[in-house]
């Protein structure tokens, strides 16, 4: 069956059409700059890539555009071939501990969580409604970034703030990148042959977070109430003293919102280096001896190592350290700098194997006390897998209900 995975932002819509359960990517694409007359629509199949610039004023138009293109390019013959749609939703709060079939009730619940993710959930909802309008009979599912972390114990997700903040406003750690962590966890359980494996995962892209996993469940993660908490990233500061916000607001004559915006969009690699938020630019500048680039990278690596060491203690040992996402999968320098700083734990890097890019590989030596792996993530596939799982569950439930009705009435 054909399932579409969708990841929508406020001005973008990323999609992938997969044949399931074969896990075959049929087509992928992206609509950027939604809301303008200079929107960019890119669609890629196995052997061809098309790109056009056109007017796309809203998400509804973007959805209609991509679905029309699938038919025009003969990727599918009719829309009826699409049997499921999975939507990435950033914030599921404490309401959702699993992906959810999209109904009027679940959509209303997602809308109720917009305060917790004002930049993301509204855009996710707009996209969901656009797909529901064009594909009203198609099975659709919300897959949340936060659900994987709902297994964290209170001691790990609560802040030491007035408790009523949590009771009244749900102030707590929610985490992010949960879909990626769930996928990597399942991959590692297969690789290690252990369901009860203790794993530390470093998801490093422009956004960076870490997760401690025990027996398939998240027990702690670095991102918090928002993705701003944790380690420095491309443009995010990571952890800072909260008093800095008030101090800078007063000194720079800015609102608190403006300072938070600076911490989200003008900090991290970009803020410290003054060069770029892109790791490739930072690494190129490091090779040239740029001290600010070196410093920006060292700060990030130091904070990542802090989390790994903390999670090692939390888990009381670890079976594997995993690097994934854009930087984690492709930067041998990034991985090397982290592992070197963890030598006290007995982890030993295999320099030759560490040259791998974008492929699964064990990158530590045979006598390393901890195994370290590169494992590519695949969030689009993970979303499609959840759609397939929930659809099969619903089909089985419908059969059980019919059987029960037959027995009662017969």
Curated annotation (Swiss-Prot):
It catalyses: acetate + ATP = acetyl phosphate + ADP. Homodimer. It is found in: Cytoplasm. Belongs to the acetokinase family. The record marks 177, 236 as: Transition state stabilizer. One of its GO terms (cellular component) is cytoplasm. This is Acetate kinase.
């Amino acid at each position: 069956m054909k399932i579409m995975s969708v990841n929508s932002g406020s001005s973008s819509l990323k999609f992938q059409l997969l044949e399931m359960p074969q896990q075959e990517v049929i087509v992928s694409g992206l609509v950027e700059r939604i809301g303008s007359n200079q929107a960019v629509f890119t669609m890629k199949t196995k052997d061809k890539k098309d790109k056009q610039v056109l007017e796309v004023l809203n998400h509804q138009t973007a959805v209609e555009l991509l679905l029309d293109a699938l038919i025009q390019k003969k990727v599918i013959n009719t829309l009826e071939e699409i049997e499921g749609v999975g939507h990435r939703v950033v914030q599921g709060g404490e309401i959702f501990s699993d992906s959810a079939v999209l109904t009027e009730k679940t959509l209303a619940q997602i809308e109720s969580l917009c305060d917790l993710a004002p930049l993301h959930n509204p855009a996710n909802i707009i996209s969901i409604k656009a797909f529901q309008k064009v594909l009203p009979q198609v099975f659709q599912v919300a897959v949340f970034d936060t659900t994987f972390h709902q297994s964290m114990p209170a001691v790990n997700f609560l802040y030491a703030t007035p408790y009523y903040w949590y009771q009244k406003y749900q102030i707590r750690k929610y985490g992010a990148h949960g879909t990626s962590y769930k996928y990597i966890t399942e991959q590692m359980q297969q690789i290690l042959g252990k369901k009860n494996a203790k794993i530390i995962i470093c998801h490093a892209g422009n956004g960076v977070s870490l997760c401690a996993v025990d027996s398939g469940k998240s027990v702690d993660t670095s991102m918090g109430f928002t993705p701003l908490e944790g380690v420095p990233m491309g443009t995010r500061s990571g952890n800072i003293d909260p008093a800095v916000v008030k101090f800078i607001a007063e000194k720079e004559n800015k609102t608190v919102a403006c300072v938070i915006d600076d911490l989200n969009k003008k900090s991290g690699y970009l803020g410290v280096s003054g060069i770029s938020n892109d790791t490739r630019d930072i690494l190129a500048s490091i090779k040239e001896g740029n001290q600010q680039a070196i410093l920006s990278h060292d700060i990030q690596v130091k904070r990542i190592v802090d989390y790994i060491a903390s999670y090692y203690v939390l888990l009381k040992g670890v079976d594997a350290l995993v690097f994934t996402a854009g930087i984690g999968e492709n930067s041998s320098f990034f991985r090397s700098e982290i592992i070197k700083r963890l030598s006290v734990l007995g982890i030993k890097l295999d320099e030759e194997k560490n040259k791998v890019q974008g492929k699964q590989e064990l990158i530590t030596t045979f006598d390393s006390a901890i195994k370290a792996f590169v494992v590519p993530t695949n969030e689009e596939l993970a979303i499609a897998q959840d759609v397939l799982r929930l659809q099969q569950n619903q089909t089985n439930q419908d059969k059980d209900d019919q059987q029960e009705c037959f027995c009662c009435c017969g």
